[in-house]
A protein has these predicted regions:
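Extracytoplasmic small-molecule ligand-binding "clamshell" domains
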Residues: 22, 28-102
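Ligand-binding clefts/hinges and TM-proximal coupling segments of bilobed small-molecule sensing domains
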Residues: 30, 158-174, 212-214, 246-299
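Bilobed "Venus flytrap"/periplasmic-binding protein-like clamshell domains
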Residues: 36-45, 55-72, 107, 125-179, ...
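Periplasmic-binding protein-like
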Residues: 41, 123-134, 206-245, 264-289, ...
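Extended ligand-binding regions for polar small-molecule ligands
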Residues: 61-69, 141, 146-147, 152-154, ...
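Acidic, polar ligand-binding/catalytic clefts
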Residues: 64, 75-142, 283-292
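Short beta-strand-to-loop elements that line the ligand-binding cleft
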Residues: 74-86, 170-178, 218
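A ligand-binding cleft/hinge motif common to bilobed small-molecule-binding domains
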Residues: 89, 104-114, 159-166, 185-188, ...
């Protein structure tokens, strides 16, 4: 009996130790010699691919700065690996340790905070509507009877439903597996509109075959804090990420990175999104925080 209890105690200790290590990113990457960044294929200027395994963008570059400091904390150079994630799998892959830091376009909300942790907000998004330029659609009320695209696993799905109930507009939702797929639904005529984060819409329009064929219209549907995501219960890594962002904000480098990706010409086509930082984004930089979207709604 004593041997059995001793074995159970050892097993419990090993399990708790393994759990602690799984949530200790600094220890994890120090032991493995590598860190995995979760990136997106088409999340506007926040995170996108150039092909051949190359990923760039505002959040990708901020994550690279965080990883620079992670290497200092680990005391070694790390092999940086990239894993393409989607709106559906980004949280599970972060939770299970496949991804160490997710650098895409994830909205910080209360439900997600129960599963993962977020760094200080680095971008405050405005949810908008993209349509074909010749559609005649200028606001959400004109979507009655239309097919409206959004991306599976994003908060825009809930937002669409709330607007449908609030305004009495009866539209059919069609879902893309990722943002590029959702834009393709609009581009091909299978959807009459695409509702998503404004910079994602602008990025997909800018990189389309005929940017002049599309436009962003209507009122701002919602304001959402977008942040870099990682595992919960890892205070040391959260502090490292937050301290990195705080230093970038204090030095003015964060504003320069924003200008680089949202105002200036970006690869691969040297297109310009021309999206100057909103007052909400500047406010997030001035008063760094990790508040969820619900806190913004209460204002």
């Amino acid at each position: 009996m004593k041997k059995h209890l001793f074995a159970l105690a050892i097993a419990s200790l090993l399990a708790s130790t393994a759990f602690a290590q799984a949530n200790d990113t600094i220890a994890k990457v120090k032991a493995s010699g590598s860190v995995t960044m979760g990136v997106r294929d088409s999340s506007g200027a926040l995170s996108y691919t150039l092909g051949d395994g190359k990923y760039v963008g505002y959040h990708v570059e901020i994550c690279q700065r965080i990883i620079d400091n992670l290497e200092k904390a680990a005391g070694k150079k790390l092999d940086v690996k990239y894993t393409s994630v989607t709106s559906q799998n980004r949280i599970p892959l972060t939770e299970n340790g496949t991804v160490d830091i997710e650098c895409g376009s994830t909205t910080n909300n209360e439900a997600r905070q129960k599963q993962v942790a977020f760094a200080f907000t680095t971008f405050v998004e405005e949810v908008r509507i993209a349509v074909r330029a010749n559609s005649g659609i200028t606001n959400i009320a004109q979507l009655n009877g239309k097919n409206v695209a959004t991306t599976t696993g994003t908060t825009s799905v809930q937002l669409l439903r709330k607007n449908e109930r609030a305004t009495g507009v009866d539209f059919k939702e069609v879902f893309g597996k990722d943002h590029a797929d959702s834009f393709l639904l609009l581009e091909s005529g299978r959807a009459d509109a695409f509702v998503m984060d404004g910079q994602i819409l602008a990025g997909n329009i800018a990189n389309s075959k005929a940017p002049g064929d599309f436009k962003i219209v209507g009122e701002v549907l919602n304001v959402e804090p977008i942040a870099i995501m990682f595992r919960k219960d890892d205070p040391a890594f959260k502090k490292l990420a937050d301290d990195t962002i705080a230093a970038l904000a204090k030095s003015g480098e964060l504003a320069k990175l924003y200008d680089k990706w949202f105002v200036q010409a970006i690869p691969p086509k040297n297109t310009k999104l021309g999206l100057t930082a909103s007052d909400a984004t500047k406010g997030a930089w001035a008063n760094l925080n990790d508040k969820p979207v619900e806190a913004y709604a209460k204002k």
